């Protein structure tokens, strides 16, 4: 059997970085994709040091929809067995939509939605042909609710949830599984392109704990994964209550966190 590879976007930090270590620790060679080439090289070196796997880094700005064209074109001619695709890349924009920069919002859609679509479409034919493969889309508990002052971010996460659920059904008889991972607040640096800089959360699950759950549940073939009791409670309420009520609740919570 050929050696298995995992492709991970947003692999330079946070959950993506932790997922790189998880898949490398599981014996997967890894292709790591993100903008920060220096950080990617450090993650790749650590994967090799810890687990002895092969690594490849692809420095690309996924807000440019053509950034991965060369990489995608090469996929069809490679003999590598890409068993896992992790669509994790993303960033956030905080602020009322009418005041935020439209180009930044479009970049957000490109990073979180367009790149996931392009990569998923690129790897699926070979996975279907082998009757084996896993797609992991990293969404959010915000996939289930409207989020004032993060409207485009939450809409992108909702897209990933809906897309993943439809794709899982389409692929039911193929042996390819689709997992959508919906974490809440994690203890990780969150970089915004909206002028708020970086802020480190002090509460919530660690990126490492979240990644461990995502890794295990992906390989088990679980479809929707919401880690943690509080997050599952939020999702339950978001599905039970009217959208207007949920939006007001989320607005209040974010204000308490100093986000608005």
Feature map (PLM): residue ranges:
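Active-site helix of classical SDR
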Residues: 120, 156
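SDR active-site lid
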Residues: 168, 172-233, 240, 244
């Amino acid at each position: 059997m050929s050696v298995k590879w995992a492709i991970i976007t947003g692999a330079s930090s946070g959950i993506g970085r932790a997922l790189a270590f998880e898949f490398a620790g599981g014996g997967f060679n890894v292709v790591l994709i993100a903008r920060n080439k220096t950080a990617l090289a450090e993650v790749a070196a650590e994967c090799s040091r810890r687990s002895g796997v092969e690594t490849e880094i692809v420095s690309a700005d996924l807000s440019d929809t053509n950034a991965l064209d060369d990489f995608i074109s090469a996929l069809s001619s490679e003999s590598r067995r890409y068993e896992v695709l992790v669509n994790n890349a993303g960033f956030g924009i905080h602020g009322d939509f009418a005041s935020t920069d439209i180009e930044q919002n479009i970049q957000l859609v490109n990073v979180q939605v367009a790149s996931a679509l392009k990569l998923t479409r690129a790897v699926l034919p070979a996975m279907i042909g082998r009757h084996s493969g896993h797609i992991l889309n990293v969404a959010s508990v915000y996939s289930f609710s409207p989020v004032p002052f993060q409207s485009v971010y939450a809409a992108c996460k909702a897209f990933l949830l809906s897309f993943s659920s439809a794709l899982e059904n389409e692929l039911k008889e193929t042996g390819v599984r689709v997992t959508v991972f919906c974490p809440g607040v994690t203890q990780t640096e969150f970089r915004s392109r909206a002028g708020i800089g970086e802020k480190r959360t002090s509460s919530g699950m660690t990126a490492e704990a979240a990644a461990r759950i995502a890794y295990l549940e992906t390989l088990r073939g679980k479809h929707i994964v919401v880690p943690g009791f509080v997050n599952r409670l939020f999702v339950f309420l978001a599905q039970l209550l009217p959208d207007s009520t949920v939006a007001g609740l989320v607005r209040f919570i974010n204000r308490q966190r100093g986000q608005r």
